[in-house]
Amino acid sequence: MAMRLVTAEEIPKLHKLVQDNKMILACQTKEKTLKILSDYLQKEFGMHANETTIASYDGYI
């Protein structure tokens, strides 16, 4: 699985995604959340979510 850095133009879109889905994601298991984010990021940006992505969305990083 190839990974890449997020571009400056993509950051606002990713922040909006997180805000729009925070309530939905909070109700999911960590594995389900990772799958949801990874699928969306792959479709929209050609990248994948990982454990670090989940931790940063949860405010741990």
UniProtKB/Swiss-Prot annotation:
Origin: domain of life: Bacteria
Organism listed in the record: Rickettsia conorii (strain ATCC VR-613 / Malish 7)
Protein name: Uncharacterized protein RC0108
